[in-house]
């Protein structure tokens, strides 16, 4: 496997949009007891349901530790799901896995960003994180794909969304946070994104969703549904702490033009809840120094925007919430050619994310 010293853009590679054809989707099996309650068993059932939903549309590869391999293999009883042994610190492959890039000659490579558990020693969610920082490299080794490594640049895949036509959306709350790349200016961060993802226009939303442990990842708040159109988490409740965040994001989106000069169409997606963990759910999480404590008084950052686009389908979270039906209807309206499949997302949310956070698509090779 090669490790180019150039950049993807210089080599003719770009990050494709999520709706472009996939070869497969990657996941990592959950087991960390100080993040997933009851030894991870409820989360494992939730991850298995997500993997099987995706497997209806495309192959899935799930990475599991040596200690969990047999259990994962037994629970993932689907002919379209492969299980491979990879050690990791937790299960957020959107943030620890590679960001795949493609060219027009049929090649696929991967960007291996630096990872510091969403903030390192200044607000990070756990320590150590070395095994998570190795996940992208291991995946690229398995796939025999060239690897671009950014040793001096920290980025999580959930902090970016692209339209595949030169535009990227992110949040200032995350990418400009001093606990990610304090040695870089906004201009330098933008230059890195342009060089490694081949984007030309970057839209900066001020914040992500309220109480998002990742410092406001955009994939829990706003995403592209097609070039020129985005889906934004939304509330009309002026007493909701998300209200001002939604308003500020809408202003930026309405004032922005993408790399093709288009004015963006903004679709609104209601925010579920408010949702909270129960005391019982919190009590099921092991208490370990350096890990994120669980508190039933803290609102969960639930979002229907945290879905995955797969080949011919949309796999989205449900929350046993009155807004579930409306969310499904909106997804079906904005993705009329896709089948919408909703999978219970509460157990994933309790761990700090949702379906988009626990998946990483690998694009299929394409020739122009």
Curated annotation (Swiss-Prot):
Keyword ATP-binding: no
Pfam short name (any one): PAD_porph
Pathway membership, UniProt: Amine and polyamine biosynthesis; putrescine biosynthesis via agmatine pathway; N-carbamoylputrescine from agmatine: step 1/1
GO terms, biological process: putrescine biosynthetic process from arginine
Primary enzyme class: hydrolase
UniProt EC number: 3.5.3.12
Keywords, in A-Z order: Hydrolase, Polyamine biosynthesis
Active site: 357 (amidino-cysteine intermediate)
The reaction(s) this protein catalyses: agmatine + H2O = N-carbamoylputrescine + NH4(+)
InterPro entries linked to this entry: Agmatine_deiminase (IPR017754), Peptidyl-Arg-deiminase_porph (IPR007466)
Lineage: superkingdom: Bacteria
GO molecular function: agmatine deiminase activity; protein-arginine deiminase activity
Family to which this protein belongs: Belongs to the agmatine deiminase family.
PANTHER family, alphabetized: AGMATINE DEIMINASE-RELATED
Subunit structure as annotated in this protein's UniProt entry: Homodimer.
Main function: Mediates the hydrolysis of agmatine into N-carbamoylputrescine in the arginine decarboxylase (ADC) pathway of putrescine biosynthesis, a basic polyamine.
NCBIfam families: agmatine_aguA (TIGR03380), PRK13551.1 (NF010070)
Name under which the protein is recorded: Agmatine deiminase
Upper classification of the organism: Bacteria, Pseudomonadati, Pseudomonadota, Gammaproteobacteria, Pseudomonadales
This protein's encoding gene: aguA
